């Protein structure tokens, strides 16, 4: 007899519309400007959670990454998600309430600058799938602008907020388009951050690099460089990507 809610969902996932069904939870995203996508899944599956005790997701959107980290981390780990856009924050809260980890995840509908100034806790793991489009050409949808464009949260401001909120030996992890990841790492270095891990990502062998996963720290140390192809040459998911997503995607 299955008594654990997470295990029950894993064995019998409920397929629903308006979102994305994972093995142990469902993410509704019909009220969010940015939908569940590969970038968020990559970050949530990859970030180092082994030594984390308190986690912050900046710009948490639907709550996807916070939920993935909750599934991967120890039961005592507490997770805060900060989201500026009201509809997304409300949907993230609903997703959390329906998940097996409702007591561990707390969603704050707030500007991250105010949160960084007033929040009493520091975090040993901070994650973000940040905006990356320049604000020269805006969307017609204000919520989508907030999610996609750096006008609401520049990368410089993001790094400053993370510095205020991170513990002395904490890790700050982001996912970005590859060229912007290079620029983000350069900017971080100017502000006293050190790159501790960099994963260069391409869709398949021989294709251009298109995404980057970065782990930053305020402490100097060895930098680990890795590569990941999401698919093999014939188009099927690569074994490395399957290993990352196997605890989350159905049929893997």
Swiss-Prot record:
Specifically methylates the adenine in position 37 of tRNA(1)(Val) (anticodon cmo5UAC). Belongs to the methyltransferase superfamily. tRNA (adenine-N(6)-)-methyltransferase family. The lineage of its organism: Bacteria, Pseudomonadati, Pseudomonadota, Gammaproteobacteria, Enterobacterales. This is tRNA1(Val) (adenine(37)-N6)-methyltransferase. Its main location: cytoplasm. The keyword Zinc-finger does not apply. It is found in: Cytoplasm. Keywords: Cytoplasm, Methyltransferase, S-adenosyl-L-methionine, Transferase, tRNA processing. It comes from the Bacteria. It catalyses: adenosine(37) in tRNA1(Val) + S-adenosyl-L-methionine = N(6)-methyladenosine(37) in tRNA1(Val) + S-adenosyl-L-homocysteine + H(+). InterPro entries: DNA_methylase_N6_adenine_CS, SAM-dependent_MTases_sf, Small_mtfrase_dom, tRNA_Adenine-N(6)_MTase, tRNA_adenine-N6_MeTrfase. One of its GO terms (cellular component) is cytoplasm. The keyword S-adenosyl-L-methionine applies. Transmembrane segments: none annotated. GO terms for molecular function: nucleic acid binding; tRNA (adenine-N6)-methyltransferase activity. Its EC number is 2.1.1.223. One of its GO terms (biological process) is tRNA processing.
């Amino acid at each position: 007899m299955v008594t654990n809610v997470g295990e029950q969902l894993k064995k019998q996932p409920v397929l629903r519309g308006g979102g994305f069904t994972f093995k142990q939870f469902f993410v509704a995203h019909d009220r969010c400007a940015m939908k569940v996508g590969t970038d968020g899944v990559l970050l949530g599956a990859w970030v180092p959670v082994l030594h984390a005790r308190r986690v912050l997701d900046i710009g948490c959107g639907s709550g996807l990454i916070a939920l993935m980290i909750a599934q991967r981390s120890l039961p005592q780990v507490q997770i805060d998600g900060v989201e500026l856009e009201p509809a997304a924050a409300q949907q993230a809260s609903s997703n959390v309430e329906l998940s097996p980890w409702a007591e561990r995840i707390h969603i704050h509908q707030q500007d991250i600058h105010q949160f960084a100034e007033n929040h009493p806790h520091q975090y040993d793991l901070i994650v973000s799938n940040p905006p990356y489009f320049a604000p020269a050409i805006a969307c017609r949808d204000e919520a989508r602008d907030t999610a996609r464009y750096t006008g609401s949260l520049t990368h410089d401001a993001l790094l400053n907020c993370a510095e205020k909120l991170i513990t002395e030996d904490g890790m700050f992890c982001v996912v970005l388009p590859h060229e912007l990841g290079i620029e983000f790492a350069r900017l971080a270095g100017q502000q006293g951050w050190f790159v501790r891990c960099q994963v260069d990502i391409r869709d398949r062998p021989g294709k251009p690099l298109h995404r980057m996963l970065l782990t930053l720290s305020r402490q100097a140390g060895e930098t680990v460089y890795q590569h990941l192809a999401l698919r093999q040459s014939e188009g099927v998911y690569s074994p490395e990507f399957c290993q990352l997503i196997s605890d989350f995607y159905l049929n893997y």
